[in-house]
Amino acid sequence: MLMIMLLLAPMLASAHNLQLHQRVAPIGVSDKGELDYVDNKFSYKGWNSAQLGGKVRVVQHIAGRTSAKELNDPLIEAIKAAKLPHDRYQTTTIVNTDDAIIGTSIFVRNSIEDSKKEFPWSQFIVDSNGNVKKAWDLQPKGSAIVVLDKEGKIQFAKDGALTPQEVQQVMEMLHQLLK
């Protein structure tokens, strides 16, 4: 019992409303939204959290600032190195450009577009109004990680930087969910 409490402690300490074995709170992003890259052209379309089922996912919600991106970079690097199967796994990165340093939003969007070119199988959502942060009750200037099973149910959630042990836990969980 103590071990379970210790494992859950980081999740209990966060203010977010992401509950294990439930779906994320429903939210849509219509201003910008999901970034597409087809025929060397970028476009945006509306996105809704109801679209998160169908694949095992890591959803990374980050403020539109370098310091937030760096918080969970060790997990993202571990995911890249694992070469997870694109037909059954997807990383969904939601960038809150409403929480960017004033005057940097265009640079943030350019960085997201570069990432989409490099990782076309990944999903990038640009949230210009901070709708997802508000709906999920996430901390400002931060980074949250949510692991979803293929039904879209939360298996892990933390608002803040993951410890090395949590990175390992998430990677082991992803491999289990993909079996």
List PLM regions with ranges.
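Sec-dependent signal peptide recognition
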Residues: 1-6
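Structural microenvironment flanking redox-active thiols in thiol-disulfide oxidoreductases
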Residues: 60-115
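Cleaved targeting-peptide boundary
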Residues: 15-24
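Solvent-exposed loop/turn segments at secondary-structure junctions
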Residues: 64-67, 97-101, 129-132, 154, ...
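A short beta-strand-turn-helix
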Residues: 27-56
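Short, internal strand/loop/helix patches
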Residues: 90-94, 106-139
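N-terminal signal peptide c-region/cleavage motif recognized by signal peptidases
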Residues: 10-14
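Thiol-/selenol-based redox modules, centered on thioredoxin-like
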Residues: 141-179
